[in-house]
UniProtKB/Swiss-Prot annotation:
Catalytic activity: cytidine(1402) in 16S rRNA + S-adenosyl-L-methionine = N(4)-methylcytidine(1402) in 16S rRNA + S-adenosyl-L-homocysteine + H(+)
Pfam families (alphabetical): Methyltransf_5
Protein residues bound to S-adenosyl-L-methionine: G97, G98, H99, D116, Y143, D167, Q174
GO biological process, one term: rRNA base methylation
Lineage: Bacteria, Bacillati, Actinomycetota, Actinomycetes, Mycobacteriales
Principal subcellular localisation of the protein: cytoplasm
Organism per entry: Mycobacterium avium (strain 104)
Protein name (record): Ribosomal RNA small subunit methyltransferase H
PANTHER family membership: 12S RRNA N4-METHYLCYTIDINE METHYLTRANSFERASE, S-ADENOSYL-METHYLTRANSFERASE MRAW
Length: 386
C-alpha cells in the first residue's frame, strides 16, 4: 500500500499533459469520447497520451443520432410542403452546426433559428452554414432565452415553431481549446465558461465558496462520493495559495481521493470537473427553464427532440416530458374530461439509444439518451379553468 501511495503522488506531480487516453471525461460531451466510450473504440487519434485536435476544414465530427433526429423532426417540418417551406426549426444548441446543416440541406424551404451561448461556436457555425445565410438567424443566448430569441427574430414566443432540437453537453470546440479549462488532461486556466463573457469561473468557485457550498456542488452536480473530503482539502490548500490552473486541482484530487477509488471508474478528476462546469454555467437550472419555454413555442403537430448525455440532465428531461404527456383530468374520475387531454404525446418509448452499428461508427453516441414529443393540442383549447 505504501508503494501505491508513492506512485499516485508521483502521478500528481507528473509533467503535463497527463498520460490519459482522452482529452477530458464528460459523460455529456457531444464530440469527445468519455471513459465509457473507449470500450466501443477510439474516436480520435492519440499522440503522447492526449487526444489530437482535428484541425481539418470539414468541421470535424459526425453529429450524434443524426438520422434518428431527421426521422423524428422531418414529419413536423414537411407537413405544409415537402421542401420545408413555411416551417421553422429552432436549434437550441447550435454548436458547430452539424444537425442544422443536414436539415437545411434536405429541406431547401426551411427556416432556422439557432441559439448558442458561445460566440466562437456561432462564428464557426456561421461559416459552416454560410450558403444558407438567407434562411438562418443566429442568436447569441443561452437556451433558456428561447422566448426572447423568437420575439427578436420576428416570431411569437408561443406556437410558432415546427421543430426544436436540443443537443445538450459540451461541444468539441470548447474541449479542444485548452485555454477554456474544460479538460483535465492538459494544464490550463480554471475557466470552464461556455460563454467567455460570463462573470463566474471555476477558479472563482474554488477560491471563494465556503466548504459546505463546495461539497454541495461536488455532490449534487458531480455525484462525487468524496465531496466532503475534497472540499475540505480545497479550503486548506487555497489558504496557502489560490487555485489558478487545472493542474493545481488535478494534483489535489489525486491526493484527496483514496487510492482504491482512483484505480476504478476513470480519471479521479472527472466528477469534480463535471460538477464545476455545471455550476459555472448553471446548466441544470437553465435546462429546467428552457424546456417549458420550448414546449410553449411548439405549434400544434410540432415536435421536439432532446439529446442528453448524462443522468442529471436526462432526469430533468424525463420528468418534464412525463408531465407534458399526462392527462389533466383528476385521477379519481373514470373518464377523460373534455379539454383535459394531454397536450403532447411521446414519440419514443422511454429513452432512445444509439444502436450497436452507430456506436461502432460513432463511439461518441454511446452515452446519449434521446427523448421526443409531439404537440397535440394548443393551450387555449383547454378552457379558462386550466
Amino acid at each position: 500500500m505504501k508503494h501505491s501511495a508513492t506512485s499516485s503522488e508521483a502521478h500528481a506531480r507528473a509533467t503535463w499533459p497527463l498520460p490519459e487516453p482522452t482529452l477530458a471525461y464528460f459523460p455529456n460531451a457531444r464530440f469527445v469520447p468519455s471513459d465509457r466510450d473507449l470500450d466501443a473504440g477510439a474516436a480520435r487519434p492519440i499522440r503522447g497520451g492526449v487526444a489530437v485536435v482535428d484541425d481539418s476544414p470539414d468541421f470535424g465530427h459526425v453529429p450524434v443520432l443524426l438520422e434518428r433526429c431527421v426521422e423524428l423532426l422531418t414529419p413536423a417540418l414537411t407537413r405544409r410542403h415537402p421542401d420545408g417551406s413555411g416551417a421553422v426549426l429552432l436549434d437550441a444548441t447550435l454548436g458547430a452546426g452539424g444537425h442544422a446543416e443536414r436539415f437545411l440541406t434536405d429541406l431547401p424551404g426551411l427556416r432556422l433559428i439557432a441559439l448558442d451561448r458561445d460566440p466562437s461556436a456561432l462564428e464557426i457555425a456561421r461559416e459552416r452554414l454560410a450558403r444558407f445565410a438567407d434562411r438562418i438567424t443566429l442568436v447569441h443566448t443561452r437556451y433558456d432565452g428561447i422566448a426572447a430569441a423568437l420575439t427578436e427574430s420576428g416570431y411569437a414566443a408561443t406556437e410558432s415553431v415546427d421543430g426544436i432540437l436540443f443537443d445538450l453537453g459540451v461541444s468539441s470546440m470548447q474541449l479542444d481549446r485548452p485555454e477554456r479549462g474544460f479538460a483535465y488532461a492538459q494544464d490550463a486556466p480554471l475557466d470552464m465558461r461556455m460563454d467567455p463573457g460570463s462573470p463566474l469561473t471555476a477558479a472563482d468557485i474554488l477560491n471563494t465558496y465556503d466548504e459546505a457550498e463546495l461539497a454541495d456542488i461536488l455532490h449534487r452536480y458531480g455525484e462525487e462520493r468524496f465531496a466532503r473530503r475534497i472540499a475540505a482539502q480545497i479550503v486548506r490548500r487555497r489558504a496557502k495559495e489560490p487555485f489558478t490552473s487545472t493542474a493545481d486541482l488535478v494534483s489535489l484530487l489525486y491526493q484527496a481521493i483514496p487510492a482504491p477509488a482512483r484505480r476504478t471508474g476513470g480519471h479521479p478528476a472527472k466528477r469534480t470537473f463535471q460538477a464545476l462546469r455545471i455550476a459555472v454555467n448553471d446548466e441544470l437550472d437553465t435546462l429546467r427553464c428552457a424546456l417549458p419555454a420550448a414546449l410553449d413555442a411548439l405549434a400544434v403537430d410540432g415536435r421536439i427532440v432532446v439529446l442528453a448525455y448524462q443522468s442529471l440532465e436526462d432526469r430533468i428531461v424525463k420528468r418534464l416530458f412525463a408531465q407534458a404527456v399526462a392527462s389533466r383530468t383528476p385521477v379519481d374520475l373514470p373518464v377523460e374530461l373534455p379539454g383535459h387531454e394531454p397536450r403532447f404525446r411521446a414519440l419514443t418509448h422511454g429513452a432512445g439509444r444509439a444502436d450497436a452499428a452507430e456506436i461502432e461508427r460513432n463511439p461518441r453516441s454511446a452515452a446519449v439518451r434521446l427523448r421526443a414529443l409531439q404537440r397535440t393540442q394548443a393551450p387555449q383549447a383547454t378552457g379558462k379553468g386550466d
